[in-house]
Amino acid sequence: MGGEYPLNCSAPGKVLLSYSESDDIKAYFNDPISKMTENTIVDYSHFISEAINIRQSGYAVDDEEFAKGIICIAAPVFNCEGCVVACVGLSTLTLYDSIHSLTNKKLELLKGVADEISKKLGYSAKE
């Protein structure tokens, strides 16, 4: 619990960065980025493609991008103005689960929690 995780290789970080202004995303990738594992995204173009998927699907995954053996899913939390102000994430070890199993078993629950928090913050999704 606690600690700091890079925005480009953690599911919560990827959610927050994906919903940032495009200039902020570019600025983030202008700084040197460490490749934490062979799965870490360090290329701006690759991340933009991932960010589009995150915005469309409403969640992000970290498939051993931050550290070998650790996987995570995260969903955005919106405020009353429709801005992402936080996210809800769930991490586990590959010893216990796979990213596909975690996504299939827990994603809807996770997104439901994020939606409930968003509603409490005054967010109303546009249908």
Stretches with model-predicted labels:
Residues 77-80:
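Sensor-regulatory modules in signal-transduction proteins
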Residues 71-75:
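Short hydrophobic beta-strand micro-motif common in sensory/regulatory domains
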Residues 86-127:
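Juxtadomain coupling helices with adjacent low-complexity linkers
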Residues 1-66:
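Short, solvent-exposed recognition segments
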Residues 31, 40, 44, 69, ...:
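Residue-level detector of alpha-helical recognition elements and their boundaries
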